[in-house]
Amino acid sequence: MYEEQLNFLKDFANKDDFYQRIALYKELLKKFNAVHNLTHLENIDDNIIDSIKILDYCDLIDKKKIVDVGSGAGFPAIFLACILENSNFFLFEPSVKKASFLRVIKTELNLININIIKEKLQNHPPFKVDLIISRALMDIKPLIEISNGFYDEKTSFLLYKGSEVYDELQGMKDYKIFNRGFRNYCLLKVKEKLC
């Protein structure tokens, strides 16, 4: 199923490890979700594919320091971290139950390249990163505003958006959109502060 929809997996050396991690993630999510109601997602496989399909469109291997804003149940950061093993991920999730779940996932999947930060991005001391990712958290401009201090002219934003992406991008210039069905992956550069 995954290799049929994800071309980059054909050349990925650690496929078996990746598939084992997916199976364990799905098992743990099912257990946690029964008690803590973490997510209402019905098709986990589709959401995993959605999380990493961007790797068919662009190479993120040079992004060594990555922030995920509003990590929730780990989409997309957990699955990107499984593939981009030489990158360090900082998952910002203020919800106690979701941050706890992410800590379990980090341990059980042996993801030594992720760090769970149980607070909102805008409340944390900033540090510069190569990539800021977010899926379905907020509109683009407010997300850029709360990311102030975490980005510079070299930083990219990777935003998982729906059909509203073009409305949200009005007035912005340096971006690319990669489309897959309902999903628009927006790769964006911000040259200066918006406000």
Predicted regions and their residues:
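Conserved S-adenosyl-L-methionine
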Residues: D68-G72
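Glycine-rich helix-loop-beta junction characteristic of Rossmann-like nucleotide cofactor-binding loops
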Residues: L55-D62, I83, N123-P126
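S-adenosylmethionine
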Residues: N86-F90, P94-C195
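Conserved SAM-binding loop of SAM-dependent methyltransferases across substrates and taxa
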Residues: A73-E85
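Class I SAM-dependent transferase core
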Residues: M1-Y2, L6-D62, V67, K97-F101, ...
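Conserved active-site region of classical short-chain dehydrogenase/reductase
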Residues: I52, I78, K141
